């Protein structure tokens, strides 16, 4: 099993994570808290209350963990295509796989990534939702003092299953969406690359960016439910399950609730995924 795709996926995931984390923090807060009137209000209040560091809450853990999970996505995707088509990453430019095989490989990578990602993503979301200012008196210390303390607290208060809260919504978000993600990327690369050649850096940037936007537009409804399920249990159980969360959210806030954060997701998706694919493709070419 080639391991280059796993390593390239980890490094490219870290690059994308650093670029996108501030957007992700604002998005998560909009989806899970009702104290903000919109994107600008959330950005202003976060900066005023917590300084610029507030936008990077919860990032230290994903740098080591979520970036590693990204290696699972790219590694499983590439190796699934290898199993389906018997062609390596470089050979696929001369012998392009079918879009059906690309979709299957993307869904497989998305499914396995979701299960690996669930505990790490939950901890990230909990940390991002802490809105205490950095300089504060000792009597109002944040609930979680860091990722390790957060994980230990969840295990103690909610049990092992607490770390996988919202995992079904995460699976439903990532499995078909990441199939579409790779289909969009490969389709755009083929459209603007001469047959048998590698796509240019500009093509990779544009294809990766639009693949990210397309996938997040379809993923946002389950992303909202995922974030709300992950915050459930922090102050008592509010939802009886994923379907109850969907029904309750719709009943209280209308259909628009399922698209909270979509503008931010789309704005974040282009630069993050453009950088992710560019670094991924560059590393694979460098090593081969």
Curated annotation (Swiss-Prot):
It is found in: Mitochondrion inner membrane. Pfam families: Mito_carr. Signal peptide: none annotated. Solcar repeats lie at residues 1-83, 97-191, 199-286. Its main location: mitochondrion. One of its GO terms (cellular component) is mitochondrial inner membrane. It is a multi-pass membrane protein. This is Solute carrier family 25 member 45. It comes from Mus musculus (Mouse).
